[in-house]
Each structure stands twice: as structure tokens, then as C-alpha cells.
């Protein structure tokens, strides 16, 4: 990268409306970018049509705007980036860094749940096959700005993981790396549920010969059952009314200072003060339920 300016991003999938857990990730990445006088980009990760909800992407963008989280530049849509992903796959193939695999989930489960390289040297064709990375640069640990050095699950880190699915869809790890590199992302601020795939993504950066970004993984908001707030767990959508109470609730969750007279501030001024007071070192590492705050 020739530009040393901070560039962050928020990259939701359009599988439903934003909820409080989504707001934490969006707000954390926004504040980190603005506190570093940086750029904050938004990307819609719409590469998995079976999981997408019609109209959700437009709703997400309206929600961000309503909550004062205004992004820089154009929104990047992964559904418009297929050619870039194909080029990346072609390059990996030309370098001998990928191969086709016809192993089923049942077979992988039968050998312990970690792919054992069964198809690595079989020279299979593309028919009814997934494409796997031929892992030559496993990443066994990485540094997180909040959590310090994180150690990977070594068998998982060494696994030849899928980069193009059997059903013809591009794998998440490939798409996110290609797009983060394309957008010049210098730091990724996101939820702790994405810690595990980070070593795979850094490994892809190394295979491509690209500089990996820095990482900061935020704690997850939990529901009353101790599960992550998510669209799959039917977390309620963000309220459509006054956005300020939810922003304050998210700031409290992130252990940030709250202006005493926040009710007198409009949303833009509230966020400006949040940027000025932003201290990521104060964020608690553990997941928690919002009701406990």
C-alpha cells in the first residue's frame, strides 16, 4: 500500500436487518477509523444468495445512515466482484496453490472434522468438486490490538481450506481477503466470533504476497440464553426511532465514556464526542449480555 492513512470498514452480510450486536461492530469500527483521522468504508457481503433476505442490504444502509454512521466513498458489493475473485483463484492455480476436492462433509467428519488432504495429489477435475488452498504458509498465531497474541488451533490452521465451494459460490475467506486488499484496509475491527478464521485470512494474504491488516476483535453481545445476538437467533432489529439511546447503550457495552448531557446532543454531536473520547484499551475482552450494563 502506498497510502499510509488508516482505512477501516464495516462489512455486513444482507441476511437480515442490523441488530444491537451489529451496531457494536459498526460503531467500534467507525470510532476506531474516525479517531485515527481515517477512512471508514462499507462493504455488503452478498456472495451467498441462499442466506440473503430480499431488501436487507438497502435496509442496512438506511439503518447506518439513520444512526449517524456515514461511510466514505461508494459501497462495495461483493456480488459485483466475481471477476476479481476468479482472477485470484486463477493466480493461485497457476502457482500450484490450489486443487479440487470431492470429499463430503460426512467423510471429513469421519476423520475427525479436520480435512486430511485426501484429494491433495489426486489431480481431480472441477466437476462436482470444491477448490481448496494447498496450504504452504500456515499461520499459527497473530496479534490482536485488544487481546494481544492469539494462538491458533494448529490442525485447523494447517488445514487445506475451501476457497471455492462445490455449489459454485466463492468462499468467504477468499472474498474477504481479496476485497480488503482491494480497498486498502489497514485494520479490521469486528466481532470476536471471527477470530477463528483470521489465521486463514492472514495465510491467504501471505500466499498472495500481500500485507495483512491489523486486527481488533470486539466482545460479543449475548442474549438471555448466553448465545450471541445474531440474525439466526432472531435478535430484534435496531429501533427506527431516536438512534441516540442505542448508540449510548453500545458505548456503555464497549466501556466508553458517555457525555453527561447526551440527551441534549444530536446524533452527529454525540458521535463526535464518542470519537474524541474513544479508548479501545478500555474495552472488556469477555462477551456479555447488554442487559447487564
Swiss-Prot record:
Positions contributing to Zn(2+) binding: 101, 103, 115, 119
Binding site for ATP: 231
Motif 'KMSKS' region mapped to chain: 228-232
This protein's record includes keyword Iron-sulfur: no
Positions occupied by motif 'HIGH' region: 12-22
Catalytic activity, EC: 6.1.1.-
Pfam families xref list: tRNA-synt_1c
Lineage top rank: taxon: Bacteria
Cofactor mode of binding and number, as noted: Binds 1 zinc ion per subunit.
Gene Ontology biological process: glutamyl-tRNA aminoacylation; tRNA modification
Enzyme class: ligase
Keywords from the named record: Aminoacyl-tRNA synthetase, ATP-binding, Ligase, Metal-binding, Nucleotide-binding, Zinc
Residues reported in the UniProt entry to bind L-glutamate: 9-13, 45, 172, 190
This protein's record includes keyword Ligase: yes
PANTHER family: GLUTAMATE--TRNA LIGASE, GLUTAMYL-Q TRNA(ASP) SYNTHETASE
Described function: Catalyzes the tRNA-independent activation of glutamate in presence of ATP and the subsequent transfer of glutamate onto a tRNA(Asp). Glutamate is transferred on the 2-amino-5-(4,5-dihydroxy-2-cyclopenten-1-yl) moiety of the queuosine in the wobble position of the QUC anticodon.
UniProt cross-references to NCBIfam families, sorted A to Z: PRK05710.1-1, PRK05710.1-3, queuosine_YadB
Family in the record: Belongs to the class-I aminoacyl-tRNA synthetase family. GluQ subfamily.
Name of this protein: Glutamyl-Q tRNA(Asp) synthetase
Organism in which the protein naturally occurs: Klebsiella pneumoniae subsp. pneumoniae (strain ATCC 700721 / MGH 78578)
Source organism phylogeny: Bacteria, Pseudomonadati, Pseudomonadota, Gammaproteobacteria, Enterobacterales
Name of encoding gene: gluQ
